[in-house]
């Protein structure tokens, strides 16, 4: 499901903590109406904030509807690594969020969404 740097684990980082800090969390309705705007919030990490420092930060997050890229948001260390996007869909799909940490690489999350 997600890229994971084994070398980092050998150096003492706990895999679970790394996942908690990196796997994006997609907050969106399970069901929406065709063609109607709704909000998708993405935050990086569950219950723990990822560092946003010059040497270690989330560089970007991308949102896909199946294989179609809906958005890409670039972050700087001055920002909080979360975003709210307003989108509309024409058919049911899997929303996927890919976030990229400059040290720990790419992490993915997915959420099924039904369009009526
Ligand atoms: Fe990281």
Predicted segments with their positions:
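Short coil-to-beta strand junction motifs in C2/discoidin
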Residues: 53-59
């Amino acid at each position: 499901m997600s890229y994971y740097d084994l070398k980092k684990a050998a150096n003492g980082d706990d895999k679970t903590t790394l996942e908690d800090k990196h796997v994006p969390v997609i907050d969106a309705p399970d069901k929406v109406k065709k063609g109607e705007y709704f909000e998708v919030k993405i935050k990086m990490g569950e219950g723990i904030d990822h560092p946003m420092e010059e040497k270690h930060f989330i560089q970007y997050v991308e949102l896909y509807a199946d294989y179609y890229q809906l958005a890409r948001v670039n972050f700087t260390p001055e920002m909080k690594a979360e975003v709210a996007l307003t989108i509309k869909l024409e058919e049911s799909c899997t929303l996927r969020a890919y976030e990229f940490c400059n040290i720990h690489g790419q992490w993915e999350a997915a959420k099924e969404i039904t369009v009526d």
